[in-house]
Every structure is written in C-alpha cells, then in structure tokens.
Swiss-Prot record:
UniProt protein name: ATP-binding cassette sub-family F member 1
Biased composition (Basic and acidic residues): 47-64, 147-160, 206-226, 559-580
Result of altering residue 367 to E: Does not inhibit ribosome binding
Tissue specificity of this protein: Ubiquitous.
Protein's organism: Homo sapiens (Human)
Top-level taxon of the source organism: Eukaryota
Impact noted for substituting residue 109 to A: Reduces phosphorylation. Inhibits strongly phosphorylation by CK2. Does not inhibit interaction with EIF2. Does not inhibit association with ribosomes. Reduces EIF2 interaction with ribosomes. Does not inhibit protein synthesis
Pfam families: ABC_tran
Residues modified to Phosphothreonine: 108
Alphabetized SUPFAM superfamilies for the sequence: P-loop containing nucleoside triphosphate hydrolases
Induction of synthesis: By TNF in cultured synoviocytes.
Any Gene Ontology biological process: positive regulation of translation
Binding of ATP 2, residues: 658-665
Length: 845
C-alpha cells in the first residue's frame, strides 16, 4: 500500500511526549529525532523523585505505544512477505497481547534502572532484559509461529509469484497442522507426479531445518536486523511511491523467498518434462469433462452417462467432445466405418480410462484363453471365482462337521443359501450348454485348451464371458471366429440377454435381430437411434437428405450475397450470424441452456459409398464344374467325404453351410483343383476360369509391393487403370501406394477383390469373404453377386449375404453334401432344435 509523500509526513504519536516515552523507543524508532528523544528519556529516568502518578501514566502510554508498534511492525512484515491482513487489530490478539504485557510488566524498581543500551545496527543482542526486551522476544516467537501457521489472506493475490511463494512455504510447516496435512498428502499418492511432489516437499523441509538458526539466537538477531534496516530505508521507499515494487514483481521477496521460488519453478519444469515424456510414451490420450454434482451423486447408478470426452490415437483425433449414454438393460450396436475408433472406445471403457460408475462391472471379450491342461468346460467354470470360493468353503466346513465341530453348521447353512442364490448347482449345465451352442461337442468340451487352435480358444473366451454375465458385456466382432451354426445360436441366445450389451459387428442380420438401439460413430461424435439396424438405416438416410437440402439452401444464399457485391468472407460472416440468431431463437423456444459452440457453416454431407463389380463372363455350356464319385480324407484321418457327385452351372448360386470341422473349406479346395481327390475326379469346362477368394488371402499377396504394383505386375495394367480398379472396391487413394504389409485386414481384402475382378472369372468361389469388411462393403458385395452373370459358390456366416443373394443352401454333414428343402429361416430353426434351444421370435422395433 503506497504511503504518504515525504513532504507531509504523518506526525508520530510519540512527538511531544518526551516525558512519557518508554524505553522501547530506543529499539524501534528511527532517525535523528530518535536519538534526541532517547537522550531526553535517559535524563528523565535519572530523576529518582518521580511521582507515582507519573509512573502509572508512563505505563499506560507505554502499553498504547507497544500496541501501535506491534501493528506497524506486523504491517511491514506482511507487506514484506506479500500478505495483506483484512483486520490488523483483531480483538482477540489485542486481549492476548494486553494480558501478556501485564504479566511481563514490573513496577518501577532497581531492575528498571538496568535498561540495556540500544541494539547496534549489526544486530548483536546485548544481555539483560526488561519489558520491551521480553516483548521483542515474544514478537520473534510470534513470527516463528506465523511461519508455521501463515494467516489466510483476505483477498487472493493478483501476483502469481506471491501465490507460488505461499505454496512453496507450505512444505516447510513444522506445526501440528502442517504435520497432519503432510501425513494426509503422503497417505495415498495418486500417481508418480504426486509421489514426486511429496518427495520434493520432504527435501525442502530438510533444507529449511538445516538452514534454520536457533530460535533464541541468530533468528531473532536476523529479524531485528531486517526490521531496523527496513525502518531505516522506509523514508526512501516512501519517496519512490512504491514504483519499484510495481515494476519488479520480485521486489517484495526476501532472499530466502526468492530461493524457494527458484526451487519451485525448477520443480514445475521437472514435472512438465515428466508429463511430456509420459504423453510421448503413450499412443492414446483421453480427456473428459468434469462430472457435475448431479452426476457425482449418481455414481452408483446402473446407467452410463459420459459427456464431452475426447480420444486421440497416434495424434489422430477419433472422438471430439462426444457423449456416451448407455441405459441399463438395453442392447446397443456400435456401427461406423472401419478405422474410426469403435474398438478403441470399447477398450477405453473396459480399462476405465473413461469415468464408468464403479458398481458397473465391465467385460470386453477380446483375448483367447490360455492354452494349458485345463479342460474347456473347467476353463469356463473357473471364470466364476465367487462360486469357487463358496465351494471351497463348503468342503472345509463339511470337514469340520465330520470332526465333530458343530459351530460350523450355522455358517454352512449360509454357504448353501448363497450357492442356491447364485445357481451353483446348474453352473456346469449352463457352461456345457454355452459351449455346445458355440460348436463344442461333448468330447471337445472335456479336451484341454492347449489342444485347440486360436480360433477355438477364442470361442472358449466368448463362452466364459457369456457364463459370467457381467453388468456390461462388450463384444467386438463376435461372429468373426464362428461358423454359421454358432452365429445362429449366439444370435438367438443374446436376444434373451437381460443385462446391458454393447456390440461392434459388421453382420447386419445379427444387429437387426439382437440390438434394441444403434450408436452411430460419425464425424467424431456418437449419434443415437432407437430400434435395430434397419430402422437406423432408414432414419440416417432421411437425415442425410435433410442435411443436403439445408446445405443447398445455404449455398444458394451465399451465391446471392456474392452476387450482391459481398466478398466471400463477408457472405460467410453474414450467413453465420443468421445461423446464430436462428440457434438462439430455437434455444429460447425449447428453453435449452446456451451452447458455447459457435455455429459453423454446413458442409456437404459425405456419402460413404462402396461399389463392387465383377465383369460378366462369356457363356459356357453346362456343366461347367463338378465332382464325380469323389472321396477325400487327409492322411491319417477318417474320410471327410464319400462318393460326392454334383455339378454346377453358370447360373448357380450356392451357399455351403454346416458346423466347423465338417469340411466346407476342403470342399472348395477340391472344386478349385488345389486338392486332389483320393478317389473320383473333378471335371470342368476347358475354358473355365475360376476366381477363388481364400479366407487366408494374405498368403497370396506380395507384402513388399504396393497394391498398384501388385496389379500392374500381375495383369500388365497401366498405372491409372490399376488405381481405378482399386478405387472401385473401396480402397482409399492414399493406400494405393503403400506397401501391402502396412495395410489393414480390410484393405488387404479389397486388394484381393480387385485382383479377382482383373482375372475376369467365370465362377466365383468365396470362402468367408465378409471377414474384415464393414457393413457397406458387404452390401456392395451382395449387390455385385446379384449383378454377376457367372456362377457363385460361397461359404459364409453372414446371414444377410446369404438371404440377399438368394443362395441355395447346401449342408455338409455325415461325409456328404445335400440341398436343404426350405429357406434360411427353416435352416435356423433346424439348427436350434438340434441343440435343444427354442427359437426366439423378437418383434422388430
């Protein structure tokens, strides 16, 4: 606070009271007048016949001056430390000071005549003591107490340096309160930065303890010296009017405080570098809006409500201010183009990188079970750890009862009740039912997991997840590792799922049957639609039409403004202002809260379109392809087929179905000539060209080449024609010149489809072609098959592809191939009945 100018100094209260001045003036007062007053004061003290009334008056005035001096010194000390006291003359402190002075004060006697000489400027304290010496000692102790318990400022400091210093002083606290706060802070460090903070505080406290002088010695001398120096320089600071302090933000800091500030800034730099290193090591970054008080109250709710979260991967933003809403008991399908972050979102939910309510147990089925000696059924049962603990306790208590310990009977009864409540008796039957539905026969259910392939171990993992029934079950492409029969069972089983479900799938038929809601990932946001995938598709198409109309209307308005003489910038600004007014009007009408996001000009809605095309073949006389009297079996195994006899024409549309392991893929290899029959022969037209899509398609690609180079080398195509062919099958232009080994599974599949088209086949033989394709690409494949004039033989677990292409169903069973009478719904019913399941007929929403 600036002081009055030197020309009109405030008159000190002690001027003119030479007769009643106290000895404290020798220590506290300043200037040449001080010395004169001190001299007069000693002369007055020498008079031994002082009246008793004058002595009492001196004591009263002495107490008043002490209070004034205390206030002045405290104010200077607060100014020096960057503090501001809201109420300097606190009533409680005054009473305490008065009581202390009364205790310390002594009547006029010989002791008072032994007043020590004033302290020299060097700060060396002379021996002896009186009322004022005791007061100075108390003041130094109060300063120590204030350093231990700094008073809370009434108003926050504007200078951030002061704030940093006050924060830096906290680790040096040595009082009871400081110890309690320190112990609380050390109890549970949240992360490595918090632990580093605690370590830094400990180091600072040790440094301060080492450098701290004795309380009764150097510290008091130092403080007295600082006080006298500041008082001596006070008049010069008044002349400057506080300008130097305003210019220099560090002017009010002592050397000790500057040293602490330097240490604090160095610590902050270390923390910042650690955070930067941590961010560089992690590929993903997540941010989320702070939860409101209402959301915090609903932490135990069964629903999930996450607002304004963002996720980026490898520097690419996947979600920006997106909202996630999941209602308990509903079954959600998460859809969107490949590579936009669907799987990433599931992993962040499972890892609780997002704020999921703690009472919701989350399970993401993504890893296959460990390959060991554990039978498949036991691997499923062991997932329920609670049941295992209860069974172990049951055995222990039964052993105690057999030994005559009757005290275990009561606890054993409670264990039985818990086992009944969890359905422990039916646990094994439930596990075997799930395994059977996923394609495990009784012998396979008891087979050790180490004897299964990766795909079958993935099925065991899926069975464990279904057996556990978590509050929120998340499945990422669950049908990829399943055959058609297992997909039919899983589809039917999940329609009766009573808990919350979140599925990522490219199987439109699966989403139509299972899901009650669709979450669409589009433009880094999540959009919600009630109903199954078919309902979503209709609503989304309508929404895109409306957006296109609004965009065209906006472009028309911009064109009119430009024609009227407005620049492009001015026209866009005026259009944005009109959008803002319209947005505010809608908010007032709907009584919505104001959005902080400024309206942006509409962009043309992007239609994600993929179109597959296969060139039409020339006509060939039937039969173009067939197996006659074929028997085949792998060496050392029983035959898969016996006496196969059938032919295929140019207009054939055949889907081969059956459980895994019966030989569907083997049958396709026999038709392509890649396998030679044990008996019989494969016959084909001599002009026939076969296009074969193998589900192990990566083996036929040259990984070191780019897609463009691969097609150019194989078919002698010009550069532009090769790129056009890749573009027709939905491969992005930037991927045309990237090495095939760096492409995703879906991108590699598109390269193989482009290669098939370049071969101009007469017959398409496709083994699980929908793996790694998104829904739009599967639709495009179905349309291409329908338009294709040649024969098509497909093995697929995608029900919609089968039904959309009107394929005849040929089932492989009992070493033979036979055609099914009826459609796909009849086949589904037949599969479920064979498993002892009842077909669920869910009404479409």
């Amino acid at each position: 606070m600036p002081k009055a100018p030197k020309q009109q100094p405030p008159e000190p209260e002690w001027i003119g009271d030479g007769e009643s001045t106290s000895p404290s003036d020798k220590v506290v007062k300043k200037g040449k007048k001080d010395k004169k007053i001190k001299k007069t004061f000693f002369e007055e003290l020498a008079v031994e016949d002082k009246q008793a009334g004058e002595e009492e008056k001196v004591l009263k005035e002495k107490e008043q001056q002490q209070q004034q001096q205390q206030q002045q010194q405290k104010k200077k000390r607060d100014t020096r430390k960057g503090r501001r006291k809201k109420d300097v003359d606190d009533d409680g402190e005054e009473k305490e000071l008065m009581e202390r002075l009364k205790k310390l004060s002594v009547p006029t006697s010989d002791e008072e005549d032994e007043v020590p000489a004033p302290k020299p400027r060097g700060g060396k304290k002379t021996k002896g003591g009186n009322v004022f010496a005791a007061l100075i000692q108390d003041q130094s102790e109060e300063e120590e107490e204030e350093e231990k318990h700094p008073p809370k400022p009434a108003k926050p400091e504007k200078n951030r340096i002061n704030k940093a210093v006050s924060e830096e002083q906290q680790p040096a606290l040595k009082g009871k309160k400081g110890k309690e706060e320190k112990s609380k802070g050390k109890a549970k460090p949240q992360n490595k930065f918090a632990a580093l903070d605690n370590e830094e505080e400990d180091k600072e406290e040790e440094i301060i303890k080492e450098k701290e002088p004795p309380k009764q010695g150097k510290e008091k001398a130092k403080k007295a010296e600082q006080g006298s120096e500041e008082e001596g320089e006070g008049e010069e600071e008044e002349e400057e009017g506080g300008e130097s302090k305003a210019d220099d933000p560090y002017a009010h800091l002592s050397k000790k405080e500057k040293k602490k500030l330097k240490k604090q800034m160095e610590y902050e730099r270390q923390v910042a570098s650690l955070k930067a290193a941590n961010a560089a090591e992690n590929d993903f970054s997540v941010s989320q809006a702070e939860m409101s008080s209402r959301q915090a109250m609903l932490e135990n709710a069964s629903d999930i409500k996450l607002e304004k979260f963002s996720i980026s991967a490898h520097g690419k933003e996947l979600f920006v201010n997106a909202d996630l809403y999941i209602v308990a008991g509903r079954r959600y399908g998460l859809v969107g183009p490949n590579g936009k972050g669907k799987t990433t979102l599931l992993k962040h939910i499972a890892n609780r990188a997002l704020s999921i309510p703690p009472n919701i147990d989350v399970l993401l089925c993504e890893q296959e079970v460990v390959a060991d000696e554990t039978p498949a059924v036991q691997a499923v049962l062991r997932a329920d750890t609670k049941r295992l603990k209860l069974l172990e306790e049951e055995r222990r208590l039964q052993g105690q009862l057999e030994q005559g310990d009757d005290t275990a009977a009561e606890r054993l009864e409670k264990v039985y009740e818990e086992l009944r409540a969890t359905g422990a008796a039916a646990a094994e039957a439930k596990a075997r039912r799930i395994l059977a539905g996923l394609g495990f026969d009784p012998e396979m259910q008891n087979r050790p997991t180490q004897k299964f392939s990766g795909g079958w171990r993935m099925r065991v993992s899926l069975a464990r997840a279904l057996f556990m029934e978590p509050t929120l079950l998340m499945l990422d492409e669950p049908t990829n590792h399943l055959d058609l029969n297992a997909v039919i069972w899983l589809n039917n089983y999940l329609q009766g799922w009573r808990k919350t479900l979140l599925i990522v799938s490219h199987d439109q038929g699966f989403l139509d049957d299972v899901c009650t809601d669709i979450i669409h990932l589009d433009a880094q946001r999540l959009h919600y639609y009630r109903g199954n995938y078919m309902t979503f598709k209709k609503m989304y198409q309508q929404k895109q039409k409306e957006l296109l109309k609004q965009y065209e209307k906006q472009e028309k308005k911009l064109k009119e403004l430009k024609a009227g003489g407005k620049s492009t910038k001015q026209a866009e600004k005026q259009t944005k202002e009109a959008l803002t007014r319209k947005q505010q009007k809608c908010r007032r009408k709907n009584q919505d809260e104001e959005s902080q996001e400024a309206p942006e000009l509409l962009k043309r809605p992007k239609e994600y379109t993929v179109r597959f095309t296969f060139p039409d073949p020339p006509p060939l006389s039937p039969p173009v392809l067939g197996l006659h009297g074929v028997t085949f079996g792998y060496q050392g195994q029983k035959p898969l087929f016996k006496n196969l006899d059938f032919g295929i024409d140019m207009d054939s549309r055949i889907c081969i179905v059956g459980p895994n392991g019966v030989g569907k893929s083997t049958l396709l290899l026999l038709l392509t000539g890649k396998l030679t029959p044990t008996h019989g022969e494969m016959r084909k037209n001599h002009r026939l060209k076969i296009g074969f899509f193998n589900q192990q398609y990566a083996e036929q690609l040259r990984m070191e080449e780019t897609p463009t180079e691969y097609l150019q080398r194989g078919f002698n195509l010009p550069y532009q024609d090769a790129r056009k062919c890749l573009g027709r099958f939905g491969l992005e232009s930037h991927a045309h010149t990237i090495q095939i080994c760096k492409l995703s599974g879906g991108q590699k599949a598109r390269v193989v489809f482009a290669e098939l088209a370049c071969r101009e086949p007469d017959v398409l033989i496709l083994d699980e072609p929908t793996n790694n394709l998104d829904i739009e690409s599967i639709d495009a494949l179905g349309e291409a098959i329908n338009e294709y004039k040649g024969a098509v033989i497909v093995v697929s677990h995608d029900a919609r592809l089968i039904t959309e292409t009107n394929c005849q169903l040929w089932v492989v069973e009992e070493q033979s191939v036979s055609q099914i009478d009826g459609d796909f719904e009849d086949y589904k019913r037949e599969v479920l009945e064979a498993l002892g399941e009842v077909m669920v007929s869910r009404p479409r929403e």
